[in-house]
């Protein structure tokens, strides 16, 4: 079934900034997709086209991207009469029309909006759930329910506190299924709220962009202590492990790192990559930290390689790899990390996201599907993580509706799968796919 009509508009993301939404019509009905947006972005990401008109939305409008869909992409796809199940063919058409390496002509936000809507329409055309259609596109016979990585303490560019490291996450790997993982996550979250309130006062329980708490603490170790205390109070010490997203590129200064980067600049407090690595190893030794994302700057290849070789945990590339096959290939060759963070808007199409995932998995890496800090109510990544069988997803705390929208969709998928549903659990890094 081909596309009858395609229409894009400006809507608002969870930070109140404009983003692109696309409506796609076939004989099966209307299929809608919205595009997310990040705060700490890797410099190698595909280009998110903003208007840069300072008189409108402080330059963050997306009317140009919307216009590219409505004036150029829509007529071309409608005229071509391509069947919506042909995801790769449609994505390739858009990439050829754009003609740039980083999608700077149309904007990755324009191309992705259409690509996501096409994928949803393709599932309906085949009469299967979206996760099943994605599994088919990826060549997976099985589907797997992921372990959620709840970002319950926010720092870095996601919060107005002094904390340098961006995310402190809990992963309920000991849960029996996704539903229980949600319960464990929610109970620890409520316990954490009480722990923070008792220690720092009620206003310390305000939440950051992703629904996690953002108490005004400076020491990263203090965040881990808060987690340890909340996990213990909830009674889940044996069922939860900890993950971190350091987003170290945000505080990289002249070959060193500034763990107090939100204060006035003072080079005397900068630490070396080796000192930072030792700090992480202390965390791994003293807390159940099993996953660290972006421990070093996106250009600090030597530090990544050294740490991954010696840390013995999951080391996740985000700013380093930006869901880009060329960057992933380099990271594989350099042995820089062992897990890919998969963000559809970093690369800008469903087909390329699937290729990035396959490339990582083929090389023995884990893959973690991820939201962005500026999100919408769109739930595409919930189906994506199940269909790609990656076994792990991070889409915020169990708080804020744009985060829960994804988790709730996975709950529905688990219910629908019934006895066929397999939960990744402790095998989240490398779930067995039949």
UniProtKB/Swiss-Prot annotation:
Keyword Metal-binding on entry: yes
One of the record's GO cellular component terms: phosphopyruvate hydratase complex
Protein residues bound to Mg(2+) 2: 245, 293, 318
Keyword rRNA processing recorded: no
Cofactor details (free text): Binds two Mg(2+) per subunit. Required for catalysis and for stabilizing the dimer.
Record keywords, A-Z: Cytoplasm, Glycolysis, Lyase, Magnesium, Metal-binding
GO biological process entries: glycolytic process
Active site: 210, 343
Pfam families to which the protein is assigned, alphabetical: Enolase_C, Enolase_N
Family to which the UniProt record says this protein belongs: Belongs to the enolase family.
HAMAP family to which the protein is assigned, alphabetical: Enolase
Name of the molecule in the record: Alpha-enolase
Natural source organism: Sceloporus undulatus (Eastern fence lizard)
């Amino acid at each position: 079934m081909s596309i009858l009509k395609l229409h894009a508009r400006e809507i608002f993301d969870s930070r109140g900034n404009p983003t692109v939404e696309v409506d796609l019509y076939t004989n099966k009905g209307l299929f809608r997709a919205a595009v997310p947006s990040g705060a700490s972005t890797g410099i190698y990401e595909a280009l998110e086209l903003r208007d840069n008109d300072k008189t409108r939305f402080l330059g963050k409008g997306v009317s140009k991207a919307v216009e590219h869909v409505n004036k150029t992409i829509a007529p071309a796809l409608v005229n071509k009469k391509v069947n919506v199940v042909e995801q790769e063919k449609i994505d390739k058409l858009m990439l050829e029309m754009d003609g740039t390496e980083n999608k700077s002509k149309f904007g990755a936000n324009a191309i992705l909006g259409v690509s996501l809507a096409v994928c949803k329409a393709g599932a309906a055309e085949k009469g299967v759930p979206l996760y099943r259609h994605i599994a088919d596109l990826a060549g997976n016979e099985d589907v797997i329910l992921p372990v959620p990585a709840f970002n319950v303490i926010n720092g870095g560019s996601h919060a107005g506190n002094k904390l340098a490291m961006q995310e402190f996450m809990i992963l309920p790997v000991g849960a029996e299924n996704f539903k229980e993982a949600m319960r464990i996550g929610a109970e620890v979250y409520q316990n954490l709220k009480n722990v923070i309130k008792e220690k720092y006062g009620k206003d310390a329980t305000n939440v950051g962009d992703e629904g996690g708490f953002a108490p005004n603490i400076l020491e990263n170790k203090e965040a881990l202590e808060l987690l340890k205390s909340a996990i213990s109070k909830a009674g889940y010490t044996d069922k939860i492990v900890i993950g971190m997203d350091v987003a170290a590129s945000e505080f990289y200064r002249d070959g060193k790192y500034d763990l107090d980067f939100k204060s006035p600049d003072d080079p005397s407090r900068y630490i070396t990559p080796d000192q930072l690595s030792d700090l992480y190893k202390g965390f791994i030794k003293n807390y159940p930290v099993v996953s660290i994302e972006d421990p070093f700057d996106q250009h600090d290849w030597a530090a990544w390689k050294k740490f991954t070789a010696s840390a013995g945990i999951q080391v996740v590339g985000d700013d380093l790899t930006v869901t880009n096959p060329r960057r992933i290939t380099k990271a594989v060759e350099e042995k820089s990390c062992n897990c890919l963070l998969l963000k559809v808007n970093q690369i800008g199409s469903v087909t390329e996201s699937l290729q990035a995932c396959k490339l990582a998995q083929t090389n023995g890496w884990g893959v973690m599907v991820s939201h962005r800090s500026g999100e919408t109510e769109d739930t595409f990544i919930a189906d994506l993580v199940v269909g790609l069988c990656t076994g792990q997803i991070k889409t915020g705390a169990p708080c804020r509706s744009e985060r829960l929208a994804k988790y709730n969709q996975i709950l529905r998928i688990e219910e629908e799968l019934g006895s066929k549903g397999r939960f990744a659990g402790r095998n989240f890094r490398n779930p067995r796919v039949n």
